[in-house]
């Protein structure tokens, strides 16, 4: 069942002025009850966003579209005669910003596109850190607490997944991206404002995340659920395919460093803490093989090294 209900939209400009308390309360409610919210007036230049969108769509047409069509042929997906549950209808590539950029290692990107994505990535990195401090304020944690936890000894990891979801002749047969929660910290999504597709699971119903011009969609990953001892939630979400239009998605993931030690914040923990303590890289190794499964068994498995192997026998695999 799909519903259209009021999705939380936060105007960050209202953090300055008499509406600050109300705005902070809206952010807190979204983190507790949605795991998602959308921000406007976030400080990112609109011309930079427009340019990134334009060049991403051009890059897909020039460098990615044929690869996507070849993938469909190789997997026998041109006709979609049956429901497909183990493949996503998406074209993607990844940019790594931190701890070391791979921006100049990606083939077929124009210099102009590289420059735009470098600028875009840096601004999103700064925005992510500002948002983490807002979460700290709402949680009663000292300013910088989440950034410090994410830092570990090597600094945070930060990367961007650039995706296109082409038109699909039979949307009922395949998802653009199967349902999952995100493993990491805080995710900042710049999505197409004309072609819909992103949905989140709330109270048993799939809810559309509305595409708003020049907005950024924020969602929380599993690590923030652990650190907040379940006060904030990572939520299942998916991308549904559409018969018309190519949906663009630029999702940037601000995650803990590989050796960051993750555990519930002491001020948020209680005697009956349900969430485990672990090293982020160990969680990612587990997540690699069970991404599209519920998060709760992952949390439980992290309490027991043997359970990790049982849940995902290939847990030694590295992932983005």
Curated annotation (Swiss-Prot):
Alphabetized SUPFAM superfamilies for the sequence: Clavaminate synthase-like (SSF51197)
Taxonomy, superkingdom: Eukaryota
Keywords recorded for this protein, A-Z: Ethylene biosynthesis, Fruit ripening, Iron, Metal-binding, Oxidoreductase, Vitamin C
Catalysed reaction equations from the record: 1-aminocyclopropane-1-carboxylate + L-ascorbate + O2 = ethene + L-dehydroascorbate + hydrogen cyanide + CO2 + 2 H2O
Domain Fe2OG dioxygenase span(s) in chain numbering: 156-256
Keyword match Transmembrane: no
GO biological process: ethylene biosynthetic process; fruit ripening
Pathway: Alkene biosynthesis; ethylene biosynthesis via S-adenosyl-L-methionine; ethylene from S-adenosyl-L-methionine: step 2/2
Co-factor(s): Fe cation
EC number: 1.14.17.4
Broad EC category: oxidoreductase
Transmembrane segments: none
Family to which the UniProt record says this protein belongs: Belongs to the iron/ascorbate-dependent oxidoreductase family.
Name of protein: 1-aminocyclopropane-1-carboxylate oxidase
Organism from which the protein derives: Brassica juncea
């Amino acid at each position: 069942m799909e519903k259209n209900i009021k999705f939380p939209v936060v105007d960050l400009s209202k953090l300055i002025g008499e509406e600050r308390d109300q705005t902070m309360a809206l952010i807190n409610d979204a983190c507790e009850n949605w795991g998602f919210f959308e921000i406007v007036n976030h400080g990112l230049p609109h011309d930079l966003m427009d340019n990134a969108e334009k060049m991403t769509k051009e890059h897909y047409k020039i460098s990615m579209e044929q690869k996507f069509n070849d993938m469909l042929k190789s997997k026998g997906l041109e006709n979609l005669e049956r429901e497909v549950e183990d493949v996503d209808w998406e074209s993607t590539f990844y940019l790594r910003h931190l701890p070391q950029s791979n921006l100049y290692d990606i083939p077929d990107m124009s210099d102009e596109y590289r420059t735009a994505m470098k600028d875009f990535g840096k601004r999103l990195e700064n925005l992510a850190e500002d948002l983490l401090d807002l979460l700290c304020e709402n949680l009663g944690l000292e300013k910088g607490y989440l950034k410090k936890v994410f830092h570990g000894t090597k600094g945070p990891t930060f990367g961007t997944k650039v995706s296109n979801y082409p038109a699909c002749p039979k949307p009922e047969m395949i998802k653009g991206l199967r349902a999952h929660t995100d493993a990491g910290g805080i995710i900042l999504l710049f999505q197409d404002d004309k072609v819909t597709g992103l949905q989140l699971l709330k109270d048993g119903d799939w809810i559309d995340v509305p595409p708003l011009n020049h907005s950024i969609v924020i969602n929380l990953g599993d690590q923030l659920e652990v650190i907040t001892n379940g006060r904030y939630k990572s939520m299942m979400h998916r991308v549904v395919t559409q018969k018309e239009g190519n949906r663009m998605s630029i999702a940037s993931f601000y995650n803990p460093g590989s050796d960051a030690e993750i555990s519930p914040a002491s001020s948020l923990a209680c005697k009956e803490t349900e969430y485990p303590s672990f090293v982020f890289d160990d969680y990612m190794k587990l997540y690699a093989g069970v991404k599209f499964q519920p998060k709760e068994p992952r949390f439980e498995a992290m309490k027991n090294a043997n359970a990790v192997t049982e849940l995902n026998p290939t847990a030694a695999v590295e992932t983005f």
